[in-house]
Amino acid sequence: MRAAGIDDLTAKQKIIVELYDKFFRKAFPKMTERLGIVYTPVEVVDFIIQSVNDVLQQEFGQTLGSKGVHIIDPFTGTGTFITRLLQSGLISKDELAYKFKNEIHANEIVLLAYYIAAINIEQVFHNIMGGDYVPFEGICLTDTFALYEKDDLVSEVLADNSTRRRKQKKLDIRVIVGNPPFLGAKLLRRGLGNDYVETL
């Protein structure tokens, strides 16, 4: 797969997801199974985001762009849910800078995916808004399952990440989008155990 010359936003996200998915399955098959790493097709991501926005409008009289509606992808992978949210047009350009800075959040436990997601999300935001490059402060390198259970294991090494993590724990998050690691949950139910057992 070659990314050069691809201008379609959906196609770019598909390439990122597929390349990362193939790489991870080949390079780290045990980690892929243990953490339940599964990547969601872009079309499914778009459907979920649109559906969430519809429910917000119908049931709560708000949208994904409404001020005060914090959004999180707790298992962000390469950031597909957040990038597609930014690209969806469901958050107007007038609302986007504020949302990006204050009310959009993402967590990832795998270091490589965390860095890819941060770059991916920042680049998509920059492509939409232009101007100076703005870092995505809403992403945390953390295990969402253990966010409230464990002390921050990397606080001394990644001080900024620890600050974002503490801040996120205080938020009133209203919307969760994403694809949780179902394989990890299946392993727990079968009693095979993994890193999450001690936090349950």
Regions found by a protein language model. Name each.
Residues 2-200:
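SAM-dependent methyltransferase catalytic region
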